[in-house]
């Protein structure tokens, strides 16, 4: 990519030309490999990127919520997401929805509640790096603690909308008062102050201690916690970074969503691989990345990502994620499945006869000798001589 007066231009060697019309130069700077794609890109490949910065933001007195769904990123038919921020003490009101909800706490801390169909209550505090999972149809809430909270929500249906959930206050606002009174065994006068519309996100005082909020019931405790301390587990570490994996094998309740938190150091990359079970949905937390997706039949397309971007890789398509910045790249891989699975290109070739691989790639023993039978999700790039 050539630059004129620090302005990027779509020129590679003797191909391309300078841009003469008005344009968004900052967007071009953020997407160098889209402005000037690698020579290896070819054919028509669907868009696999959308930024939360380009979404509508729902502002409330206690915080905000914005979403990336199939409406914003059409290829993402199986997963949708919400970025939510709550001020200290603010509450995402009691509600439920048809879709299961998976969450990663990015900033601050919050208290979550959920009650299952047997009337068993679960209440816990979650902090940065923690997860929660609420099965479809079960009522729950989120309240920010002292520092406030910001988190990513992922739902197992791409057409989910944060504006179409079942709210406690919305339901009661659209139910006759005499019915509500009869249901709870009170008079209409005793419920005269019920809100006339949904609260959704609203300000409130900070809660007391977690111990004081625990509610014991006659039906005992839930069999498995609905929260998970992801960063307390041992990651898969390599020279180039580390990976934390959470799925139904270690986070028992997470039956429809599996995940990986990936850190890629500068000069390293998430290795060439693919996923044999489902599509991959991504959220970029920090750093700068590029990813090329191989769609078969000679088709491939490269994308750039940074904090706040959503990425996507369709089922079984080969790809890598490279750190192109000077700080650690941190991102989430999310899958609509009960378990995490990937196939490493390096390991695949290492587990085949050497001469068989050499015949395919027209490479010699020097190449096959360095193949690894062990999987290394993140690899450090070797400098060329």
Curated annotation (Swiss-Prot):
Cofactor: binding details: Binds 2 manganese ions per subunit.
Region (Disordered): 24-47
The enzyme's E.C. designation: 4.1.1.2
Reaction equation(s) it catalyzes: oxalate + H(+) = formate + CO2
GO cellular component: cytoplasm
Stored SMART domains: Cupin_1
Residue positions of the active site: 333 (proton donor)
GO biological process, one term: oxalate metabolic process
Keyword Plastid recorded: no
Protein name, per record: Oxalate decarboxylase OxdC
Species of the source: Bacillus subtilis (strain 168)
Chain's gene name: oxdC
